[in-house]
UniProtKB/Swiss-Prot annotation:
Record's protein name: Ribosomal RNA large subunit methyltransferase H
HAMAP family: 23SrRNA_methyltr_H
Family to which the UniProt record says this protein belongs: Belongs to the RNA methyltransferase RlmH family.
Binding site for S-adenosyl-L-methionine: G108
Binding partners and assembly: Homodimer.
Keyword rRNA processing part of the UniProt annotation: yes
A GO MF term: rRNA (pseudouridine-N3-)-methyltransferase activity
Species the sequence originates in: Lactobacillus gasseri (strain ATCC 33323 / DSM 20243 / BCRC 14619 / CIP 102991 / JCM 1131 / KCTC 3163 / NCIMB 11718 / NCTC 13722 / AM63)
NCBIfam families the UniProt entry points to: PRK00103.1-3 (NF000985), tRNA_RlmH_YbeA (TIGR00246)
Gene this chain is encoded by: rlmH
Length: 159
């Protein structure tokens, strides 16, 4: 299985980098994991709704350039479907069973993802109604993917 995580912006904090690197290393026995960072669009603090959409569109094009046609795509979104860890693990197992060996996860920038990115998604996934910094979302996402692998392997990691 190939897991790709496409995210907007650079990860600066060492503690996030270290945590993500640890989970990516642990997942090595289950999947090849690749994290691709696309540049965030520089914008002033206060934006009009039209300017927000423009920023999302620019970032969206950068995201879509990193996604291939055959990939199954999850986009993280507050309005996405919430799942339990067990449900998510079953979904990943089912995807591989039914021929999806290339799975891509998208984490948008601080304004979210464009309509074009959301339309490309095979599924919108939510990790709750809370708003999180996208840097933290990367760590949460890789931990949940790792947890899914551990559930599917029967490991006691998930109790």
């Amino acid at each position: 299985m190939n897991i790709k995580i496409v995210c907007v912006g650079k990860l600066k904090e060492k503690y996030f980098k270290d945590g993500i690197a640890e989970y990516v290393k642990r997942m090595g026995r289950f999947a090849k994991v690749k994290i691709i960072q696309v540049p965030d669009e520089k914008a002033p603090e206060k934006l009009s709704p039209a300017e927000m959409e423009q920023v999302k569109e620019i970032e969206g094009k950068r995201i879509l350039d990193k996604i291939k046609d055959k990939e199954y795509v999850y986009v993280t979104a507050i309005k996405g479907k919430e799942r339990t860890s067990e449900d998510f693990a079953k979904e990943l197992a089912d995807l591989t069973t039914y021929g999806h060996s290339d799975i891509t996860f998208v984490i948008g920038g601080s304004l979210g993802t464009s309509n074009a990115v959301n339309k490309r998604a095979d599924d919108l996934i939510s990790f709750g109604k809370f708003t999180m910094p996208h840097q933290l979302m990367r760590l949460v996402l890789v931990e949940q993917i790792y947890r899914a692998f551990m559930i599917n392997s029967g490991s006691p990691y998930h109790k």
